From Swiss-Prot:
Residues 117-129 have a biased composition (Basic residues). Interacts (via C-terminus) with histone H2A-H2B dimers; the interaction is direct. Interacts with HIRA. Interacts with CK2. InterPro entries: HIRIP3, Histone_chaperone_domain_CHZ. Its main location: nucleus. The modification Phosphothreonine is found at residues 135, 141, 167, 391. Phosphorylated by CK2. One of its GO terms (biological process) is chromatin organization. One of its GO terms (molecular function) is H2A-H2B histone complex chaperone activity. Residues 60-469, 546-601 are annotated as: Disordered. Keywords: Chaperone, Chromatin regulator, Nucleus, Phosphoprotein. This is HIRA-interacting protein 3. The lineage of its organism: Eukaryota, Metazoa, Chordata, Craniata, Vertebrata. The modification Phosphoserine is found at residues 85, 96, 98, 134, 152-153, 163, 205, 207-208, 231, 234, 238, 313, 359-360, 384, 389, 396, 398, 564, 575, 595-596, 600. GO terms for cellular component: nucleolus; nucleoplasm; nucleus.
């Protein structure tokens, strides 16, 4: 083979295999040719010849690059004329959107798309097999097949994405058509002009797919017209229905929104005042909003009125609030009547509280302080004026974390007996400034009384800390051994649990416990100690012990330090009678008398 023909063949094959011809240079072609030939360098004549070949073949390949893109379609039509000769199926990728939109009434809109995909895949496989078998150069044909496969896979991916969009649009249209009432069957025979159809197709699909959609729309004229007409009719009906449904929804949404805002505001204000009721200004404000006609505000006013009484009325107010938010605006009159009744009840309660206050002013300061402290914890208290509300909130905030347990106890025990006193105290705080001062004193006393139990709590905590489970277990073992110890003296110097445990273990060892202590061992040790005590009580040698603290009689006889107390006792007895010494009598049967006499002398 001539070197010129070999160069020409190489350049053509290289340009066919190259994916991007714009990046090809003379140096790249020369390097590839040297690798192909297996040489180190080229002669100047060969370089010039290769340069001319590149300049000749490169424009040709660039001109043919556009035709290479349509090569897979050409192969498909050429190799498998039966499944791919139909132009409609060939261009299904572009026409699938108009076809699916024009036939929404079909039960399965993805059926033809899946069939066409399978036919495309089979055509592509056959074409690739033919190309691989027919070509002579293995390397070049492999590259061509790879390029064709990439292009076809990209096309198929685009087609699948478009078909997925089409199926989603079709499902949306079906869901809209299910919820709306369709018109009469006579509308199926009508046809919409081609311009309207073209306009809708442009809105649904992109401008790049316009021509294919128009061709498909001409073929599917009648079905597309019917579908468009139904969609337009449904689009005309939907705004009217939405307008009709939006008005009651907007009203109910407003009511629910206001209810939520009020509820959230109350929940924010309640933690500061855990049990305190509403102030007069807030009650008047809530009562003034009743006449607005909004059902949620009326229910809220009912709830606020209900909190003035006992805890049961607050639950009723919450139930009325929920009913007011769910119901429509027709229940406004009933809500106004309920709120008026609540207001009248509040006024009567305040008047009765003032009367009771005039009668209860002569009572002692202790009863007033107790009533004021109880009034802060009761849910029926109305509160003082707006100026004192901030300070009372701060006091209640400081007391909230300390006396929650005491408040619960006081509520459960004094709820029935102290309602009248709390109301009278709260009404007196509204009428005159003196009770407010007394209430402040009562609150300060209650806060001091609340702060008083803290040391007891600390002592209890320290006791709980001393009574560690292991410490308590060892104490129980010592008690089971029959020994009773003063643990305050024994464990007074210990500052940790380990030190206490070591002291208690040493005490058990001193009692005779060996190994790991247990209740059975302790019971056995107790029996042994009791038996040993009985034996010691019966021993004669233990009548008078020479050990122990010094007696007073030793001070009278300074020379008798070396002598035992028994000898001194006998000496004193023998000194009275100057007789010859006889054998000492056995005083064992009289040891109690002798020991008591010796102690008393």
């Amino acid at each position: 083979m001539a070197p010129g023909d070999e160069m020409r063949k190489f350049t053509r094959s290289f340009f066919r295999a190259c994916p991007d011809l714009s990046s090809v240079t003379h140096a790249i072609v020369r390097q590839k040719f040297l690798i192909h030939v297996g040489r180190d360098h080229l002669e100047p004549e060969e370089k010039q010849a290769l340069k001319r070949l590149v300049e000749e073949e490169l424009p040709k390949m660039q001109a043919d690059a556009g035709t290479r893109e349509g090569k897979p379609d050409f192969i498909k039509v050429k190799r498998s004329p039966a499944p791919c000769s139909d132009p409609k199926k060939k261009r299904f990728r572009f026409n699938s959107e108009s076809e699916s939109s024009s036939s929404p009434s079909s039960p399965d809109g993805s059926g033809p798309s899946t069939k066409n995909r399978t036919t495309k895949k089979t055509c592509l496989r056959r074409a690739l097999k033919k190309a691989v078998e027919s070509t002579d150069e293995d390397h070049q044909t492999d590259l061509d097949a790879k390029m064709g496969l990439e292009e076809s896979s990209e096309g198929e991916a685009e087609g699948s994405v478009r078909s997925g969009k089409v199926t989603e649009e079709e499902e949306d249209m079906k869901q809209e058509q299910k919820g709306q009432v369709r018109k009469q069957a006579g509308a199926k025979d009508k046809q919409v002009p081609l311009k309207a159809d073209r306009k809708q197709v442009r809105e649904e699909s992109g401008s790049s797919e316009e021509e294919a959609v128009l061709q498909r729309a001409k073929v599917e004229g009648s079905t597309g017209a019917n579908c468009q007409e139904e969609s337009e009719e449904s689009g005309e009906e939907s705004p009217a229905k939405k307008k009709e449904l939006s008005e009651p929804r907007s009203r109910s949404n407003r009511a629910e929104r206001t209810a939520r805002e009020r509820k959230s505001y109350k929940q924010k204000s309640r933690p500061g005042r855990p049990t305190g009721g509403l102030r007069d200004s807030e009650a008047e404000k809530e009562g003034g909003t009743v006449g607005s006609g909004d059902s949620s505000e009326e229910g809220e006013a009912e709830k606020e009125g209900g909190t003035v009484g006992s805890g049961d009325s607050s639950e009723k107010g919450e139930a009325e609030k929920e009913e007011g938010t769910v119901g429509s605006g027709d229940s406004s009159e009933e809500g106004e009547e309920h709120s008026v009744k609540r207001k009248s009840k509040v006024r009567t309660q305040t008047e009765s509280g003032r009367r009771q206050n005039t009668s209860s002013r002569d009572d002692s300061n202790s009863t007033q302080e107790q009533a004021a402290a109880q009034g802060t914890t009761k849910s029926g208290s109305l509160g003082s004026s707006n100026g004192d509300s901030d300070t009372e909130r701060e006091v209640s905030d400081s007391q909230a974390g300390q006396n929650t347990k005491e408040e619960r106890k006081s509520r459960s025990s004094n709820k029935s007996s102290k309602n009248g006193q709390a109301r009278s105290c709260s009404s007196s705080s509204d009428s005159s400034p003196e009770p407010t001062g007394q209430k402040g004193k009562a609150r300060s006393s209650s806060s001091s009384s609340d702060s008083g139990p803290e040391p007891t709590g600390r002592k209890a905590a320290s006791r709980c800390g001393e009574d560690h489970p292991a410490v308590a277990r060892l104490k129980r073992y010592i008690r089971a051994c029959g020994a009773h110890r003063n643990y305050k003296k024994l464990l007074g110097s210990c500052s940790s649990h380990k030190a206490r445990l070591s002291v208690l273990r040493a005490e058990l060892e001193a009692l005779g416990m060996k190994g790991n202590p247990s209740l059975e061992k302790c019971r056995a040790l107790k029996l042994q100690r009791e038996e040993a005590a009985e034996v010691a009580a019966l021993d004669v040698a233990n009548i008078i012990s020479s050990t122990g603290r010094p007696r007073r009689r030793n001070a009278w006889n300074p020379s008798g330090e070396g002598t035992s107390p028994g000898e001194t006792y006998r000496r004193t007895l023998d000194s009275e009678e100057e007789q010859p010494r006889q054998a000492p009598p056995d005083w064992s049967h009289m040891r109690d008398i002798i020991s008591s006499d010796g102690d008393s002398s």
